[in-house]
């Protein structure tokens, strides 16, 4: 299982339970108020269009190859991405591993 939080332009996803997830086959889809972001984050990345550089944890290329329970990943959506994260917006994140959806998460942006 995974937990999702969002504050300002910062999105944090935490691995809360279950098997470790190999990052080599992980894909993330992010949406705001029902609309997918124009630019989706590759995993892992250091710099990517539509995102501030230097994500932490599971999304940073310097991390382990597996995302284990208790570990988090944080990224920041840049103002050049569309739609932007606004307070109160409904943020959705879907995690896919090897083409199979492993999590569908939702929260309000704080």
Which residues make up each language-model segment?
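N-terminal export/assembly leader peptides and their processing motifs that target proteins to secretory
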Residues: 1-110
